């Protein structure tokens, strides 16, 4: 019995002095918040919005990106009273049309809306003041994206700094994903050194 206790004590002491090299990261949360009472329903009128849509917010506007639309892909509403303002982003393969819409980013300082097109590997720029008054407004190309490493989503801060989710294709059906900094002016992308183990080799479907 004494020998068993001694061995157990040595094992415990050894465990206390050893340094763990296991990486720790948060996988699940137990916090549940009921937001039912905070949901506000508003009428979209004649604007039809598909099931694959994302919401974006600017200082004055609520923008809804409808990724399944075959007409106008971005619908703009007043943020305060939810009144409809206009729709932009024609679907298509023409020079000023969006073929495969990605994420939207907003430059509040210069009233610009940036829209990614992953088919053309370009980011288009819309002047928010102009689209409100000109129904024939045509966007400009802000920048081209690199096919070997490009942002799938990003938080725009200024032309030289965005925090982006970067995609690096590894085959026709797989890619690696990183969080990093992106300079929109120069195209420079600096991935973070650490990558989460659950975002490796995701399959494109």
What are these regions (language model features)?
Residues 14-15:
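C-terminal motif of bacterial Sec signal peptides marking the signal peptidase cleavage site
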Residues 120, 128-160, 164-170:
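Asp-box/WD-like beta-propeller blade repeats and closely related beta-sheet repeat scaffolds
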Residues 51-56, 103-109, 150-161, 205:
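Structural signature of eukaryotic scaffold interfaces centered on beta-propeller domains
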Residues 57-67, 111-117, 124, 159-173, ...:
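Short beta-strand elements that form the blades of beta-propeller/WD-repeat-like
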Residues 24-50:
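A short helix->beta-strand "capping" segment at the edge of beta-propeller domains
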Residues 70-75, 121-127, 171-180:
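Structural motif
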Residues 83-118, 140-148:
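Blade-loop segments of beta-propeller domains
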Residues 40-73:
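Beta-strand-rich domains and repeat architectures in extracellular enzymes and scaffolds
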């Amino acid at each position: 019995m004494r020998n068993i206790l001694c061995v157990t004590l040595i094992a415990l002491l050894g465990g206390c002095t050893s340094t763990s090299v296991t990486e720790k990261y948060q996988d699940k949360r137990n916090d549940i918040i009921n937001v039912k009472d905070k949901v506000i329903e508003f009428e979209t009128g004649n604007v039809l919005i598909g099931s694959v849509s994302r919401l974006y917010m600017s200082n004055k506007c609520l923008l809804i990106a409808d990724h399944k639309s075959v007409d106008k892909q971005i619908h703009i509403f007043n943020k305060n009273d939810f009144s409809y303002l206009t729709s932009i982003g024609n679907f298509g393969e023409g020079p000023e049309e969006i073929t495969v819409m990605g994420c939207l980013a907003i430059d509040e300082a210069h009233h610009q809306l940036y829209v990614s097109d992953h088919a053309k590997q370009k980011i288009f720029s819309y002047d928010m003041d102009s689209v409100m008054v000109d129904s024939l407004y045509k966007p400009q190309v802000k920048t081209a994206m690199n096919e070997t490493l490009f942002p799938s989503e990003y938080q725009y801060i200024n032309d030289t700094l965005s925090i982006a989710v970067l995609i690096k294709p590894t085959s026709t059906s797989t890619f690696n994903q990183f969080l990093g900094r992106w300079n929109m002016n120069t195209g420079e992308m600096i991935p973070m050194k650490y990558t989460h183990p659950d975002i490796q080799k995701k399959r494109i479907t």
